[in-house]
A protein has these predicted regions:
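His/Glu-based metal-binding/catalytic segments typifying zinc-dependent metallopeptidases
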Residues: 26-86, 215
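Short, conserved, surface-exposed binding loops centered on an aromatic residue
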Residues: 45-48, 90, 103-106
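Charge-rich, well-structured scaffold segments of protease-associated domains
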Residues: 1-28, 63, 71, 93-219
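M16/MPP (pitrilysin/insulinase) zinc-metallopeptidase core fold and M16-derived inactive scaffolds
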Residues: 78-96, 108
Length: 219
């Protein structure tokens, strides 16, 4: 149990003891990484909706807390984590191929996911251009300004999380499962500042396309 805020510890303890819970020991596995396969998985379904969806799933060998953790986070920020990212700027704004678009990184499951809401006739063009944004990161095709802008957005997100009860409890829960303690804000920022272009390119080159999903809207 995790409690946060202004409360009476004795009252809380008495309530918990009244439940009769007993401690359990178990091997909780919080990290899952599906082995990479040379076979690209593809799936498609049709739904009676107006907008279509294309998703690209990438195998990401990094784990929470390892040396690739921060480079992967910055790489994802450059790719599609923010409004200035490559997916939003190039695929949505410049090419006009998507209504919504983003990328998400889950280091607990080793998955990098790109998502876009599109018109069905733009399926192949959007998919190719989305993948090309990652290829550009692998080649180092991004500016120092874009890198610093991404780091600043990550810093702001972290700062905001310091005042968010849900984020604080989530961090405490992760630390209890992983047996690690959170680095303080200053230490985390110092490590973030050390992430350079080479580190991001290495991280991006470790990411490989594993699956493609298309939901075709047929309204």
């Amino acid at each position: 149990f995790f409690f946060l805020g202004d409360f009476n510890e004795i009252e809380i303890q008495n309530v918990l003891e009244s439940f009769g819970f007993k401690g359990r020991e178990g091997d909780v596995k919080v990290q899952y990484c599906q082995p990479y396969s040379n076979i690209l998985q593809e799936g498609m379904i049709r739904k009676n909706v107006g907008q279509s969806i294309v998703e690209l799933g990438y195998h990401c060998p990094s784990e929470y807390g390892d040396e690739q953790h921060l480079p992967m986070i910055v790489m994802n920020g450059l790719l599609g984590g923010f409004a200035h990212s490559k997916l939003f700027t190039n695929v949505r704004e410049n090419a006009g191929l998507a209504y919504t678009i983003s990328s998400q990184l889950d280091l607990f499951s080793g998955l990098l996911r790109m998502y876009a809401g599109i018109d069905r006739e733009n399926r192949n063009q959007a998919r190719k251009m989305m993948n090309n944004q990652l290829i550009d990161l692998k080649k180092g095709y991004f500016t120092e300004f874009e890198l610093e802008q991404t780091k600043e957005m990550i810093r702001r997100s972290l700062l905001l999380s310091q005042d968010n009860q849900g984020s604080l409890i989530e961090r405490a829960y992760q630390n209890s499962l992983l047996g690690k303690s959170s680095a303080d804000f200053k230490s985390w920022i110092e490590k973030l500042e050390q992430v350079d272009k080479d580190a991001i390119c290495r991280a991006a080159n470790n990411v490989k396309l594993q699956a493609i999903y298309f939901m075709e809207g047929i309204e």
